[in-house]
């Protein structure tokens, strides 16, 4: 006999677990299936903007994560070709509840969310790999491969939060439209004192060869250094090349310890729909962007919690299922109109090869640095990712505070300009 839930979520990453917690808080019975033996600690996006801190506080886990992670209020942009570095500092803004961004590992966020979700009855099953689904008139049956053989689970709804290579999306026959970039990114976690070299707690390094995103991850001196390399280089030897790249970023210092590393391809893609029959998508399974600027995690989490709100309302009989199509349309709009263009512009600026354009980028960065509102604009842009929360009595109806501040972010196309 298949086990019955209101919702099955595939994927126990931060989006999957935050979505599970949000659904459980609405009273839904939730089962999470994760193919790995435990929550994975891999180098991935680790910055939570003020627009996401709203979610963490509403779900009741922000204080716990603040105690684990690192609160950052500075952002550095470095253009070595011109010997230029700028620092933008975020300051308190009246009407905005947070003046910092939280740096925390995805594994910590997922773990804390899981612990809170389990207290509400969410079942989290590791070593459960989704291998088949059967969408029926009254719900969906999911087959998972386990160490003890295949098991089946039944639910009204299935959410794929299982990453850019989503099995759920593939099994549901949902196309992942867009393109994949020719470059490969390598994300590394490293113990090294970047501050002594003039880096800030979060940094863009703009260079046509040695672009990088460098950020402090915790209070113990662990940093994320993510850089780009040609995808034609052999994947199996990427670790050997890390030291060559570090030579440039660390200016010849050998005083570092590599903790972990992970290569991955970059995408600008979204599901052609995020709702098909009884299957829904969230996180990178719904839409995947290059990581420049941290908007992928931000938008993925917002897609998950908006989905939890509308789906919870459907389960309770407060909303018609048609709201799920509106959810799909709105989250795809936010991705293609806000997230993807901004992340694409960030990536372009970081790796720009044209000398004339690099001069223009330098001027834009200088202007940002000289603008007294620069820190505010940098911080506020990510609120555009919230979009329409679709219900007048949504849990998130008051999440966007930007209409109440004196700065207008409507015309901004990205975080820098």
Where in the sequence are the language-model features?
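Core beta-strand elements of the Rossmann-like FAD/NAD(P) dinucleotide-binding domain
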Residues: 3-5, 148-157
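A conserved short coil-to-beta-strand element within the FAD-binding core of flavoproteins
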Residues: 126-140
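Active-site-adjacent segment of FAD-dependent monooxygenases/related oxidoreductases
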Residues: 44, 48-118, 216, 339
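C-terminal helical "tail/cap" subdomain of flavin- and related membrane-associated enzymes
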Residues: 310-417
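Conserved mid-domain beta->alpha element of the FAD-binding
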Residues: 11-21, 113, 160, 258, ...
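N-terminal Rossmann-like FAD-binding beta1-loop-alpha1 element of flavoenzymes
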Residues: 3-32
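Conserved FAD-binding catalytic core of PHBH/FMO-like flavoproteins
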Residues: 115, 157, 161-266
């Amino acid at each position: 006999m298949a086990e019955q839930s209101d919702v099955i979520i595939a994927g126990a990453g931060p989006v999957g677990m935050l979505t599970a917690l949000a659904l459980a808080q609405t009273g839904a019975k939730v089962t999470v299936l994760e193919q790995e033996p435990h929550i994975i600690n891999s180098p991935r996006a680790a910055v939570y903007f003020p627009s996401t801190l709203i979610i963490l506080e509403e779900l009741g886990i922000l204080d716990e994560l603040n105690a684990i992670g690192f609160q950052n209020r500075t952002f550095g942009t470095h253009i070595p070709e011109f010997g230029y570095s700028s620092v933008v500092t975020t300051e308190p803004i009246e009407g905005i509840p947070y003046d910092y961004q939280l740096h925390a590992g995805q594994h910590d966020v997922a773990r804390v969310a899981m612990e809170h979700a389990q207290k509400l009855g969410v079942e989290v099953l590791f070593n459960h790999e989704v291998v088949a689904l059967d969408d029926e008139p009254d719900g969906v049956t999911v087959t998972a491969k386990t160490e003890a053989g295949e098991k089946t689970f039944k639910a009204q709804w299935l959410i794929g939060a299982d990453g850019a290579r989503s099995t759920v999306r593939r099994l549901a026959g949902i196309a992942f439209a867009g393109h994949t970039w020719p470059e490969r990114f390598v994300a590394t976690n490293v113990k090294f004192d970047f501050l002594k070299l003039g880096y800030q707690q979060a940094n863009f390094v703009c260079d046509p060869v040695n672009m990088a995103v460098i950020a402090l991850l915790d209070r113990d001196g662990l940093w994320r250094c993510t850089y780009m390399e040609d995808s034609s280089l052999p994947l199996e030897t990427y670790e050997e090349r890390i030291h060559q790249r570090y030579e440039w970023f660390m200016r010849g210092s050998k005083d570092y310890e590599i903790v972990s590393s992970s290569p991955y391809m970059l995408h600008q893609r979204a599901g052609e729909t995020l709702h098909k029959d009884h299957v829904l998508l969230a996180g990178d399974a719904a839409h995947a962007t290059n990581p420049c600027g941290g908007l992928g995690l931000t938008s993925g989490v917002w897609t998950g919690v908006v989905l939890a709100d509308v789906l919870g309302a459907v389960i309770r009989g407060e909303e018609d299922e048609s709201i799920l199509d509106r959810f799909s349309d709105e989250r795809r709009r936010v991705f293609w109109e806000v997230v993807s263009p901004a992340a694409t512009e960030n990536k372009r600026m970081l790796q720009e090869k044209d000398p004339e354009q690099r001069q223009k980028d330098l001027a834009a960065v200088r202007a940002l640095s000289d603008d007294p509102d620069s820190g505010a604009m940098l911080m506020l842009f990510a609120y555009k990712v919230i979009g329409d929360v679709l219900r007048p009595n949504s849990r998130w109806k008051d999440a966007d505070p930007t209409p109440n501040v004196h700065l207008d972010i409507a015309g901004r196309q990205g975080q820098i300009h």
